[in-house]
């Protein structure tokens, strides 16, 4: 493990290994309130559901290092308002923005460079920094390999100085700032720096622990004030990859089980689309390029494009149809004319990202689960009388009395199940 990076470079230089060929077979799912109410139950269901799909991930020989697991939740304002006060600032009622960031644990100069970069770019974009918070963790639950590669896990708390911004405008400014930070970090060669999430709406907790240990490692998740309207969870199984903290999912917009067989073509086509990208919504389109970072896995690349579509104004259901379309034909006798015209338009806009896939995704207005056009990855769901949707790779991930179940089933090829949160 100590020589991991050195040996990995030897393999890459010899063209024996490439990150671009990485694929996963995982467990994925969504818990959501069908009436759009934040609750502790959604968070606890999400944690329990993640624990239930532990068998969809691999375990290292040390018995504690996993391939990666994580959960994506809304930002609980009461919880983080207290953390802001600890920094010596008063929360003035403005939107609380939170960045979940991995830093190189044993390189203090790189840590300082990364923090300076984050603060500098956010300040340039008219954000004010409340401060940094070291996320409380329990490394005792980690295996030896996970602990050796464990990053310094921190959160940056901040706000925008213009309170008149709409939620979407604020998210766009945060997104553009994050992209600038990422580009500068690559330029400055800051290794071990990774932004899990940077948002005014949600936060992602993930890592190389066992799924059952997520709340034991991230102590924040045990706080009763941690409430949410949705929980997207993911258990990674690396079929031909080396696990790492940054490759654990969920990513910023979605969690993905499957593989994109058209990945190389999709990546090349995105480079073409970048030449035509233009929008008055962003300060400078060059800040957003490249949309797909070099060396990204297929899941990470899909997430990058999905996120860009969301942040540009496309809803999560529409973004799914653009990237992972239904199987359809102009000769269909059952498909309505309106649907044919929609699919024809989307087909002319974006090439399909094809391959076996089940996803759980959110744009902070919609929370969805969906299947690929052939239905090659399972996605099952249960809707309970207490207005909770439980969807994922397995049925029975959360214990619900049969008498409390309104409906249950599975998604067919190309189908989407969504909740407007």
Regions found by a protein language model. Name each.
Residues 2-421:
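Conserved short alpha-helical segments that host acidic/polar catalytic motifs at enzyme active sites
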């Amino acid at each position: 493990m100590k020589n991991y990076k050195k040996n990995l470079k030897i393999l890459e230089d010899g063209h024996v290994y490439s990150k671009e060929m990485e694929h996963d077979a995982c467990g994925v799912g969504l818990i959501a309130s069908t009436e759009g109410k934040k609750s502790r139950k959604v968070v606890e269901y999400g944690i329990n559901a993640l624990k239930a799909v532990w068998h969809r991930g691999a375990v290292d020989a040390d018995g504690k290092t996993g391939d990666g697991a994580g959960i994506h939740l809304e930002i609980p304002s009461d919880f983080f308002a207290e953390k802001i006060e600890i920094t010596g600032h008063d929360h003035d009622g403005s939107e609380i923005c939170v960045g979940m960031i991995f830093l190189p644990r044993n390189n203090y100069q790189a840590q300082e460079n990364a923090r300076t970069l984050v603060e500098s770019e956010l300040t340039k974009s008219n954000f004010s920094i409340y401060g940094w918070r070291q996320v409380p963790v329990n490394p005792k639950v980690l295996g030896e390999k996970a602990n050796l590669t464990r990053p310094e896990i921190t959160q940056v708390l901040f706000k925008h100085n213009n309170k008149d911004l709409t939620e979407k405008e604020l998210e766009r400014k945060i997104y553009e700032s994050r992209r600038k930070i990422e580009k500068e970090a690559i330029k400055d060669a800051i290794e071990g720096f990774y932004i899990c999430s940077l948002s005014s709406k949600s936060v992602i907790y993930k890592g190389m622990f066992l799924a059952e240990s997520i709340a034991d490692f991230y102590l924040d998740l045990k706080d009763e004030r941690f409430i949410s309207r949705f929980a997207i969870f993911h258990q990674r199984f690396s079929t031909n990859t080396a696990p790492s903290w940054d490759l654990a999912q969920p990513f910023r917009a979605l969690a993905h089980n499957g593989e994109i067989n058209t990945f190389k073509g999709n990546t090349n086509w995105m480079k073409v689309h970048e030449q035509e990208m233009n929008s008055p919504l962003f300060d400078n389109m060059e800040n957003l390029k490249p949309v797909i970072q070099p060396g990204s896995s297929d899941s990470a690349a899909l997430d990058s494009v999905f996120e860009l579509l969301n942040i540009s104004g496309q809803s999560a259901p529409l973004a799914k149809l653009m990237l992972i379309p239904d199987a359809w034909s102009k000769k269909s006798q059952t498909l309505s004319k309106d649907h044919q015209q929609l699919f024809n338009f989307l087909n002319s806009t974006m090439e399909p990202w094809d391959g076996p896939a089940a996803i759980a995704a959110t744009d902070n207005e919609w929370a969805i689960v969906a299947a690929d056009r052939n239905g090659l990855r399972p996605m099952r769901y249960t809707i309970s009388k207490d207005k909770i949707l439980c969807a994922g790779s397995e049925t029975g991930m959360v214990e619900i009395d049969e008498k409390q179940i309104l409906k249950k089933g599975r998604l067919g090829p190309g189908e989407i199940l969504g909740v407007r949160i």
